[in-house]
């Protein structure tokens, strides 16, 4: 049975073939072209967190997780660091989750023996962060090679613990944090680190200390752990005016040369406090560091 032709001589089969080709091309274009992000959404079950999508959502897109200090919240740390607007404009999926609450009603991350599970609650925050990443990845395209953490104090402890116990993290920015003495940290792939610590920090001391009857490392030994992970050599040092309140170039930046593709920097703020004064471009500085890193 012959198919009828239109006036141009094209058959029904010709038209069907063109339609299939157009559909395939449209699908390919959709998969490889960044799209305008849809609405934010909620994940996390009984510890819900809003997933903030960027202005332009790449396929896949990097994921940034902000981890707060003890007794605060993701919202309060966001208010301090102002990460969200830069993450949105720079194409990052962004979350600022909350830790569990203890017997005093204060939030914490069960990061290590020293920080900051004061009541020895049965909380697996590594599994919680894993679940957040998995749930977000099921709903929007997350790049598994570009998962980043920013943590302050207890959140920095949690960032170190998560990076050491999983192979999901490409890079960390840690402010005023540390690790337990003799940490077990052996990720199978390099983890870039920007470690920021003030010499006048009275909460998490630069030279190490004791919390919850357990010792935590000095900032130098914390960095040494990642020198080993990333096979880094001696650092070059330069001065920077980072803290807008402290006069002069108060911050020494130690920039290490590593035998992997990872980057390692230690920013030591002379007279810097536990909650340092941040410059107006802080979010841009740390996100620029993170976006250079990949697994």
Predicted regions and their residues:
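The conserved beta1-alpha1 loop
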Residues: 65-71, 176, 197-198, 270
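Bacterial N-terminal signal peptides
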Residues: 24-30
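Conserved alpha/beta-hydrolase "acid-adjacent" motif
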Residues: 202-207, 211-218, 277-279
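Sec/Tat signal peptide C-region and signal peptidase I cleavage site
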Residues: 32-37
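Primarily recognizes the serine-hydrolase "nucleophile elbow" in alpha/beta-hydrolase
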Residues: 137-190, 202
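Serine-hydrolase catalytic machinery in alpha/beta-hydrolase-like enzymes
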Residues: 40-148, 158-161, 280-283
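C-terminal catalytic histidine-bearing segment of alpha/beta-hydrolase fold enzymes
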Residues: 192-196, 227-295
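Acidic beta-to-alpha connecting loop that harbors the catalytic carboxylate
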Residues: 99, 199-202, 209-210, 270-273
């Amino acid at each position: 049975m012959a198919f009828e032709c239109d006036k141009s001589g094209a058959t029904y089969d010709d038209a069907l073939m063109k339609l299939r080709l157009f559909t395939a091309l449209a699908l390919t274009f959709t998969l490889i072209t960044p799209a305008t992000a849809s609405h934010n959404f909620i994940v996390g079950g009984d510890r819900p967190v809003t997933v903030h999508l960027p202005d332009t959502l790449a396929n896949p897109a990097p994921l940034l997780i902000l981890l707060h200090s003890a007794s605060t919240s993701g919202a309060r740390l966001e208010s301090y660091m102002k990460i969200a607007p830069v993450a949105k404009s720079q194409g990052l999926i962004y979350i600022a989750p909350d830790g569990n609450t203890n017997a005093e009603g204060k939030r914490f991350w069960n990061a290590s023996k020293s920080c900051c599970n004061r009541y020895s609650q049965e909380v697996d925050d590594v599994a919680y962060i894993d679940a957040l990443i998995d749930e977000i990845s099921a709903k929007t395209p997350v790049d598994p090679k570009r998962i980043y953490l920013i943590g302050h104090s207890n959140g920095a402890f949690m960032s170190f613990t998560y990076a050491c116990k999983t192979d999901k993290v490409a890079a960390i920015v840690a402010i005023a944090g540390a690790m337990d003495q003799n940490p077990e940290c052996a990720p199978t792939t390099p983890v870039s680190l920007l470690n920021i610590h003030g010499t006048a920090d009275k909460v998490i001391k630069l030279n190490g200390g004791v919390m919850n009857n357990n010792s935590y490392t000095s900032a130098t030994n914390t960095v040494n752990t990642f020198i080993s992970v990333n096979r880094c050599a001696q650092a070059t040092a330069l001065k920077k005016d980072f803290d807008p309140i402290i006069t002069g170039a108060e911050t020494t930046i130690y920039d290490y040369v590593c035998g992997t593709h990872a980057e390692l920097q230690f920013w030591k703020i002379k007279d810097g406090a536990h909650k340092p004064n941040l410059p107006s471009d802080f979010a841009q500085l740390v996100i620029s560091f993170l976006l250079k890193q990949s697994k």
